[in-house]
Regions:
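Conserved donor NDP-sugar-binding/catalytic core segment of glycosyltransferases
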Residues: 1-35
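A short, conserved alpha-helix in the catalytic core of glycosyltransferases
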Residues: 1-2, 52-54, 58-78, 83-112
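Conserved acidic
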Residues: 6, 90, 150
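Short, flexible, basic/aromatic active-site loop/helix in glycosyltransferases
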Residues: 16, 33-60
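Active-site-adjacent helix/loop segment of glycosyltransferases
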Residues: 19-22, 96-150
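Short glycine/proline- and charge-enriched loop/turn segments
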Residues: 32-33, 50-53, 78, 119-128
Length: 150
């Protein structure tokens, strides 16, 4: 992942391909729909070929499950916005603010991470809570970014 910063000098954040523990593809970077809902590239699609991806490619955002960025950029944009606490859309907002600084958001197909999706919130909250929290934060996110996304 570190190599991406050398190859792509304007890189603001880089993330790996994410897989569920069983090995199924969770996402290869993310796009954003005009309504703020994510497009998780390749999600659960057995025909999606990670090997066919470029080594580094631009995406709208990468998941905070595994995200690398420069400390100076993190401090300059003020880190994660606490308005999204405790979870959901904080990583998406962070990447949007980096993009607003002219930084690129990159996926590297050369790194993979196994991720138990929603494990943090499901350990203390219900699936219904996670859905409500995600939707609440999507609306906050759209309040900040709707003009850019549409």
């Amino acid at each position: 992942m570190l190599k991406c910063f050398e190859i792509q000098p304007d890189c603001g954040a880089v993330g790996p391909v994410l897989r569920w523990p069983a090995g199924t593809l969770q996402e290869a970077g993310c796009g954003l729909q005009p309504d703020g809902y994510p497009i998780r590239h390749g999600r659960g699609d057995p025909s999606f070929s990670v090997k066919a991806l470029k080594r580094y490619q631009l995406v709208d955002y990468v998941s905070g499950a595994c995200l690398m960025m420069r400390r100076t950029d993190f401090l300059e944009i003020g880190g994660f916005d606490p308005i999204y606490s405790p979870a959901y859309y904080e990583d998406t907002d962070l990447c949007m603010r980096l993009r607003g600084m002219g930084k690129a958001i990159c996926l590297t197909s050369r790194a993979e991470c196994y991720h138990i999706e929603n494990a943090t919130s499901h350990g203390v909250e219900s699936a219904e809570w996670a859905t409500r929290q995600s939707e609440k934060n999507r609306l906050i996110f759209m309040g900040k970014w709707d003009k850019i996304l549409k």
